[in-house]
């Protein structure tokens, strides 16, 4: 009988809303595309999630890809608390599974700044889990 459930976070328990955040910050058209390619679509994004780079280091790497948008790239990091949105079902579902006796674990790729910015809000379901392993840990 299955008694343990292991969840990823992104696009399972939270919506990774980088497109909406970028639009909210006023990035449109070519600017949107250049900033996206310099950040979330850049291989350095995964290295940052792994915890191998500081925020300052990754911003510098991203800015190398789009130096004219360094200010905007910095602005993204001032809005890390808005880059994901908790799915409505995430909290109730994790509580229900826990009440039914399932042991819930999290295994996910997350950067430390995004984790810390969302811990009390969009990652509130973590209170229901038995353990977690994030890529930055």
Please name every model-derived segment.
Residues 2-92, 99-100, 111-115:
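N-terminal helical cap/lid subdomain that shapes the substrate entry/recognition surface
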Residues 108:
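Short beta-strand/turn micro-motifs composed of small residues
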């Amino acid at each position: 009988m299955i008694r343990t459930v292991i969840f990823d976070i992104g696009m399972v328990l939270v919506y990774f809303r980088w497109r909406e955040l970028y639009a909210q910050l006023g990035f449109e058209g070519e600017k949107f595309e250049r900033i996206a390619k310099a950040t979330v679509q850049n291989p350095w994004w995964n290295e940052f999630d792994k915890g191998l780079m500081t925020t300052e280091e990754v911003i510098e790497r991203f800015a190398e890809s789009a130096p004219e948008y360094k200010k905007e790239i910095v602005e993204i990091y001032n809005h890390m608390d808005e880059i994901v949105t908790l799915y409505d079902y995430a909290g109730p579902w994790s509580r229900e599974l826990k009440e039914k006796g399932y042991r819930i674990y999290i295994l996910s790729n997350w950067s430390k700044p995004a984790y810390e910015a969302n811990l009390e809000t969009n990652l509130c379901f973590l209170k229901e889990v038995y353990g977690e392993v994030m890529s930055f840990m």
